Structure formats: C-alpha cells, structure tokens
Amino acid sequence: MTKMNVESFNLDHTKVVAPFVRLAGTMEGLNGDVIKKYDIRFKQPNKEHMEMPGLHSLEHLMAENIRNHTDKVVDLSPMGCQTGFYVSFINHDDYEDVLNIIEKTLNDVLEATEVPACNEVQCGWAASHSLEGAKEIAQAFLDKRNQWSDIFGEGK
C-alpha cells in the first residue's frame, strides 16, 4: 500500500478493534508547541457506525464539556465515516490523563439534560440531534473503558 498524506489512510482499519483511543499524530510548531491528535474510535470500522443525530449531539456535548476538564484542547471533531472523533491537545502528552478527560466528558454527556447550541443560530443543522442517541453512544463507550488502550484487541 502506498504511503498517503493522511495518517488514518495508512491505518489498516481491518486490524483495529473498537472501542479505543489511540495517538494518531504529533506535530511540533516553530516555537516548540506540540499538538497531539487522538483517534477516539467508538465503532468498529466498516462494521458499524453512529447514527447522525446521536453523533451530532455527542459532538456538541463533548466539544462543550471537554473544555471544563482541560484548557489544552485545540479541537474535537467527528470523523466523516461516523465511527469516531478526533481530539487534539496542545502541550499535553499524558495519555492516561487524556483517557481520564474523555471519561469525565462522556460522564457529562450522561448527565446532560439538553444539547448545547442546538438551535438554528448556533448550529448548521439544528434539526438533526438526539440527546438520547448521544447518551446511548457515550454509555456504550464507557462500558468498555478497560479496552480503550487496546487498539488491536491484543488483551493489553
């Protein structure tokens, strides 16, 4: 397989076992700042996916709430394949802490009573949301917390 510019295109999606959180990239800026991008994979690639209303609400909830647990988040974005999200941190390289931040954020999702910015002024497709769908996705991921570090299903 020819090496491609996009990191995830070089990942053999048939070898990973979701759910997991993996370091997907590191970039150093000219002034020494380091950005680490993580792949938060909720669903098994090419086998299952998140339905868009739940995924969309999960995106809003995670993007808003993760910033309550750290000031190091640069961005949190859904994958187009609907199997996960990317989250990027600046000058933060503690993987276990990243897992804890994600866990706290998903617990916030379970406690939510509404989806933030779920209106036509603040959202580009406000009609496509499901708080219950987001909670179901979050709970399923949290239920397998002990597997998050085992990217290839090796029991590590």
From Swiss-Prot:
Cofactor binding annotation: Binds 1 Fe cation per subunit.
Gene3D superfamilies hit by this protein: S-ribosylhomocysteinase (LuxS)
Gene Ontology terms for molecular function: iron ion binding; S-ribosylhomocysteine lyase activity
Iron as UniProt keyword: yes
Record-annotated disulphide pairs: none
Iron recorded as keyword: yes
Coiled coil: none
Alphabetically ordered keywords of this record: Autoinducer synthesis, Iron, Lyase, Metal-binding, Quorum sensing
Cofactors (names): Fe cation
GO biological process entries: quorum sensing
Protein residues bound to Fe cation: 56, 60, 123
Top-level EC class: lyase
Known catalytic reactions: S-(5-deoxy-D-ribos-5-yl)-L-homocysteine = (S)-4,5-dihydroxypentane-2,3-dione + L-homocysteine
UniProt-listed Enzyme Commission number(s): 4.4.1.21
Function: Involved in the synthesis of autoinducer 2 (AI-2) which is secreted by bacteria and is used to communicate both the cell density and the metabolic potential of the environment. The regulation of gene expression in response to changes in cell density is called quorum sensing. Catalyzes the transformation of S-ribosylhomocysteine (RHC) to homocysteine (HC) and 4,5-dihydroxy-2,3-pentadione (DPD).
Subunit structure as annotated in this protein's UniProt entry: Homodimer.
Family according to the record: Belongs to the LuxS family.
Protein name per its UniProtKB record: S-ribosylhomocysteine lyase
Gene encoding the protein: luxS
